[in-house]
Amino acid sequence: MAQQSMKVRPVLLKRSSLESVELVKQPHHRRSKSQQVRFKEDGNIKNPTGVTEVNTQTPEDPGVMGKAQASRHHHPTTYSLSFPRSHKAGGFRSISIQTSPSLRKHFPVFKRKKLTTSKSLVEMPTASPSAIQVNGNLSEQDIVSSDLAFLRLAQHLEDGPRRLKIPHPFLPRMPKVQSNGPVSFCLESGTWMSSEKATAAIQVPDDICHSPTWEARESALSPESSAEESNSIPALISMCPGDGQRVMTSELERMPPCSNTNSSASNMPGTEKLTPELLLPKDNPDDKDLGLPSSQSKKMCVPSPPRTHSSPEPGSRSQPVHLGRSSDCPASGDNHQDLESLRSSSASKSVPVCWEHVTKLPSQSDTPELQTGVGSEQLPASIPRQENRAQSSREIGGSNHSHLAQGELCDLQGRLQSVEESLHSNQEKIKVLLNVIQDLEKAHALTEGRNFYRTGQDLNNCSTCQNTACIIYSVEYDFRQQEGRFHEVLQSLEEAEPTEEAPSPPKSPAEAPVPEKQDLRRKSKKVKKKCFWWI
């Protein structure tokens, strides 16, 4: 099977690379050969990274992706060694890590793109009249959230890495969405510059797209969300000039819960109600009406690279709100400059803050402080809980400290038992060895015609005594050594006994085997006297 796939694969690779127009050059064939060796054991036809773009693209625009691939070769400096994005090629998942250096150079630098907006975003062409210009001051969170908002229109979500193409009235091509690994926003550089199609690769964590609640919300809410989006986006696009379009659409897609209650997408003062209390079930009586929009906003607010997204349970309506966005939303009005400042402030929040407030939202929904605002009241509400936890931890620490002495005693008793067992086993070994020596001696005496024998009597003539005495001495030496360790343990126990008077009752059974040990030593001494009487 592997050999057949090896024979079939180069033909398919050449065909697909020819479909991507003559701009795809010879290096693609070299890379496909190296990758053919790499994926030989899979038995499934997997395309190399350079060709998967062509296969996942619709057959009507292979030339555009060919330009994109050609433009990659002109920007070798923007790539560094990083983990490859696994593409959905032919329905199969490539599971092996690409270690060849010629395959690694496609993948962009993530660190630089987290800090500043990438060149490819700023240099996006305005050739098509409906193309959206991106302001250089925008954070990548805006682009991620606005692009991910269209994910809810896709009803053919599958498990594993996926690339979706969804049409949109303002974009000629919907950005491709790929879910694998951590949330990171990476743009194939040169694609925006060389083509009119906006193709971005957004990596979404697996727990978002794979969780049943995500897919349930996806299937249940896609008709409503599509209708709402068709109403909302044109209204705000008409409000804002060129560079502000992206800002307002992304902002609107975060705010449909409150604007939906007024049944008007352009009613922006309704956003002054968008505080996390709307999304908590016990604070707002109107939440029954807002249930679907709140869960819908869960879908749209997919965090940017520095954040993590918790897939909430269906029962809890609490949205994983970014703290900056939730606390700043009441101040947002009609002007998009405030919204830009909100984006920059919310983008600066770190992961622990987000997680802290996500975990606190459902648990503290009963406290009245939340109704005045999350940013100012949540931390004081959490202070008494932390004090209670600290007190309980102190009590547990005290009880652990009291139990510590008993634990050490149990440990010492266990060591004592192990030493006793080793002593018993060594004594049995000595007895067995002595019996073996006596049997050998008896056999020697009978063969030599002697009717008498004493163990170790004939050291000069008896080869058995000469060969086995060292064994007996070595066993005896080990026995003495372990006996010395046993006495050390006993002394440590006796020293610990006057200092700790409380654990003295459980100590008494541990002292019981001591006379037995003395009896055993007496017996072993008698045996030694019998065996080594000449010493």
UniProtKB/Swiss-Prot annotation:
Residues 219-232 have a biased composition (Low complexity). It comes from the Eukaryota. Residues 23-85, 215-346, 360-387, 493-528 are annotated as: Disordered. The lineage of its organism: Eukaryota, Metazoa, Chordata, Craniata, Vertebrata. Belongs to the INSYN2 family. Keywords: Coiled coil. Residues 411-448 form a coiled coil. Residues 46-59, 258-269, 307-319, 361-375 have a biased composition (Polar residues). This is INSYN2B protein. The keyword Coiled coil applies. Pfam families: FAM196.
